[in-house]
């Protein structure tokens, strides 16, 4: 926690009386000057260390790179320098568990939330929001180091896969037929039908994993520790073993139902329209292009931590970006439980925003039913303006998570 200086922090010799003998007085002044110089040097050193994470190339070079993409060296630096120490969460987020994730897409379009910067948390649902918001740059922040390794795996697959067919083939270790032409414009339902029947192949798995490791090490210039390698093996093997049936896992869930990857891809908005990033060639290619430009940057960080989110905000501000959308899932629920929500709000305050900057929240309908819940969904996805959030926070409106999700939210459009 930051603490404002108080009177007790003042130097006990802050006011020094004049000394009778000029020589002694001069010595005191010299000592005070030396002490001040040392203090100034110490403060400067602290500032330099704090700014090191976002210093990078000069501003003009950063903006040029952001148009054309970041170099591998700069991508690697950002992943490394913006990240905090990893933390623990009791789930394997192989996939999202939010079937309502498309319900706010029409509202995003209506508000005009597009371009700028996207910030998100969690696995593949971010790719759909990126496809809809069309940001110039994206940061994916997660407290679990394994989640960042999973995103590096995704990034490698995007680099290697020129089509949606190839993406799912690499992700699931299901080889594509060599004697059959596959249409780049095929419906996602047809693509899913093929992979629902395809069998995993151990040779493809080994070859693909080697290619993914090589891309992470050589193309992205990320050095994986032994623990990171084990995490990559675990995640990629899980996709091989479970295929399109893979789903979110939580310790102690007692076999509770979570949607499979296939079911998530098949989800529609409230008007019956498919919208996953794999639903159209155009959306897939946008997300792939952003990855290939090294502009989807995974960062290990705590929303309420002292470094990652604030450093992302500093980087965006220096680069001339404003936040278009910040997808928080239901992380804020845990921030309230852990008593650190105010620290998160202060981190949000450090982000460059406009009146169009929006939160995307996923609210579980477990302890109460949200008024905006749509039939057939256990999650309600909502929007909120970031500037409204900060105003409400300053007015003390958010004493509980329920207060947060029930105050000044933007509900999904009604299907009627």
Identify what each model region corresponds to:
Residues 1-34:
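N-terminal secretory signal peptides that target proteins for export/translocation
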Residues 39-52:
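Bacterial N-terminal signal peptides
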Residues 49-64:
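Signal peptide processing junction and immediate N-terminal pro/mature segment
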Residues 67-110, 117:
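Mature N-terminal segment immediately following signal peptide/propeptide cleavage
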Residues 113-124:
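Conserved class I S-adenosyl-L-methionine
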Residues 125-133:
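Conserved SAM-binding loop of SAM-dependent methyltransferases across substrates and taxa
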Residues 136-297, 392-416:
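Class I S-adenosyl-L-methionine-dependent methyltransferase module
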Residues 243-416:
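Alpha-helical subdomain
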């Amino acid at each position: 926690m930051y603490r404002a200086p108080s009177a007790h922090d003042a130097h006990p010799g802050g006011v020094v009386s004049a000394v009778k003998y000029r020589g002694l007085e001069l010595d005191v002044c010299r000592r005070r000057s030396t002490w001040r110089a040392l203090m100034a040097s110490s403060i400067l050193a602290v500032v330099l260390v704090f700014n090191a994470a976002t210093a990078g190339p000069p501003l003009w070079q950063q903006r040029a790179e952001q148009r054309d993409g970041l170099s591998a060296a700069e991508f690697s630096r950002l992943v490394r320098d913006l990240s905090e120490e990893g933390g623990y969460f009791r789930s394997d987020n192989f996939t999202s568990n939010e079937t309502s994730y498309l319900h706010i897409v029409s509202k995003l379009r209506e508000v005009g939330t597009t371009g700028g910067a996207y910030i998100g948390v969690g696995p593949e649902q971010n790719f759909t929001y990126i496809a809809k918001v069309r940001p110039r740059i994206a940061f994916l922040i997660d407290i679990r180091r394994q989640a960042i390794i999973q995103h590096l795996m995704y990034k490698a697959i995007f680099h290697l896969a020129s089509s949606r067919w190839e993406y799912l083939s690499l992700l699931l270790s299901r080889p594509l037929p060599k004697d059959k032409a596959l249409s780049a414009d095929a419906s996602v339902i047809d693509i899913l039908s093929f992979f629902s029947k395809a069998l995993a192949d151990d040779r493809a798995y080994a070859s693909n994993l080697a290619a993914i490791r090589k891309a992470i090490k050589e193309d992205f210039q990320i050095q994986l520790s032994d623990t990171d390698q084990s995490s990559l093996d675990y995640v990629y093997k899980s996709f091989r073993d479970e295929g399109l049936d893979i789903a979110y896992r939580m310790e102690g869930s007692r076999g509770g139902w979570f949607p499979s990857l296939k079911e998530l891809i098949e989800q529609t908005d409230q008007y019956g329209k498919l919208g996953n990033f794999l639903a159209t060639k155009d959306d897939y290619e946008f997300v792939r292009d952003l990855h290939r430009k090294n502009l989807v940057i995974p960062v290990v960080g705590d929303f309420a931590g002292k470094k990652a989110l604030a450093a992302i905000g500093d980087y965006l501000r220096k680069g001339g970006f404003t936040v278009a959308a910040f997808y928080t899932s239901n992380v804020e629920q845990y921030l309230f439980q852990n008593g650190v929500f105010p620290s998160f709000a202060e981190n949000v305050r450090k982000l460059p925003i406009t009146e169009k900057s929006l939160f995307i929240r996923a609210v579980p309908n477990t302890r109460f039913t949200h008024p905006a819940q749509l039939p057939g969904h256990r999650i309600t996805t909502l929007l909120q303006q970031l500037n409204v959030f900060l105003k409400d926070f300053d007015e003390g409106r958010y004493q509980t998570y329920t207060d947060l999700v029930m105050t000044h939210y933007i509900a999904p459009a009604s299907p009627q």
